[in-house]
Amino acid sequence: MKINIIAKRIERLDKLISSNTDFSRSEVVEIIEKNCCVVDGKIQNKKSTIINPDSKIEILSVNSTEKKTYKKINTYLVDEDIIVVEKPANMITHRASKNNDVSLCEHIVNSYPEIKSVGDIDRPGIVHRLDKDTSGLMIIARSANAYEKLKEMIKERSISRNYEALVYGKPKLKEAMIDAPIIRDPKNPIKRRVSIGGKESKTSYRIKKNFEEYSLLDVKLFSGRTHQIRVHLEHVGHPVVGDNLYGNKKSKLTRSFLHSSKLEFFHPMKNKKLSFESPLPLELKKFIETIS
């Protein structure tokens, strides 16, 4: 697969790719140096190459020569139809053509090979996702019937999803519903932003604890847009701590302070109510200790 970019202004090749994709800086350099970047039909292998407006850039797949190392993912439930797992931070949910990281999806398929034939071929078993820097609870479909039912449940919003988020500042209201439509940012395809005419998006929050410069929130999703919690909290002036995309402050965290802490839903095949809770990961607990 290829990634296509149209240059909008005069810009260095490496900066142009970085601003239009979510590759890391080292990945951008690797793409260019391995002759995987084509500009107006010609391979460019110098990161300092100046690109003119309206130039067409094609990024080809970069094949990693490193052997994949699989991890055993923490599980909360495993049966013949579903698996409830805890995704670590700094792990993508499923592979994209532009990312060579081993995904949660690949780790799960390595442990449960039968999932390979469930759902979409490029993201088997996946019915919802968490951002790379977000940790916590996820449901994986293990059977085709469960996959279809879970997708329907997600669409009908019958799965309750709660998150813990540490944000900058102190919201004026102890509890609130953020009802603000979200669109893809026309200036940055990686980002989303609130805009009239966007897709309906609702997020509620409740303050769990206030600190001097921060607030710990219990956040609940009522829709599932890309980056929804991060976009909504930034929109009301309280971005998530450690969020390098929507925040403008540096943090000592190696990830965003956003954790999928609770899932409640009826089993897709057994109609039995299930509830799972996941404690904050150690890094987030330690950060709370430093600000208390």
Predicted regions and their residues:
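RNA pseudouridine synthases
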Residues: M1-S292
